[in-house]
From Swiss-Prot:
Zn(2+) 1 binds at C115, C118, C136, H139. Residues 42-54 have a biased composition (Pro residues). The keyword Nucleotide-binding does not apply. The gene is SAP15. This is Zinc finger AN1 domain-containing stress-associated protein 15. Residues 1-61 are annotated as: Disordered. May be involved in environmental stress response. GO terms for biological process: protein ubiquitination. Zn(2+) 2 binds at C129, C131, H145, C147. A zinc finger (AN1-type) spans 109-155. One of its GO terms (molecular function) is ubiquitin-protein transferase activity. Residues 18-41 have a biased composition (Low complexity). Induction: By cold, dehydration and salt stress. Pfam families: zf-AN1.
Amino acid sequence: MAQESCDLNKDEAEILKPSSSSSPSPSPTTASPSPPTAQMTEPPPPQSTPPTPPAAAAAASAAAAPQFSAKNCEGILIEVSKKRKLAEATATDANAVVVAAVAEPLSPVLFVNRCNVCRKRVGLTGFRCRCGELFCPRHRHSETHECSFDYKTAGREEIARANPVIRAAKIIKI
């Protein structure tokens, strides 16, 4: 099995296989068996260690660093993505708080458990109309709250679905 290592300099960890003089097996993530340095499109960020030749760096990392298996890299990938998602979530939450603070005085106050007509608290006895609003027992009927739902058209469609038009086949009379 070829040696695998994790490149943690990128945002997402990838499994990179170092090039060797023996016959390299094709990587499932890449189409060409070129070395990992040729696959990188952007330069890696500067590190605190002095730069070393690629062959010496591969030999030093193989001798000194523990070898990572695919499972370890997947765990690191998950941790990195969780951290990134958490950072994005906190950034969007901060933006949402600023937007909510600006928009809060302008937005109307919504009452969830109140009648839409008389603003009486309905609790568990509220009636949800077909127009989507909540009403008390006095205003639950469509005539009392000027309902926008078209009951006549809905009734016609329901009857048409329940009673399809049946036409008899033509009979040839002799």
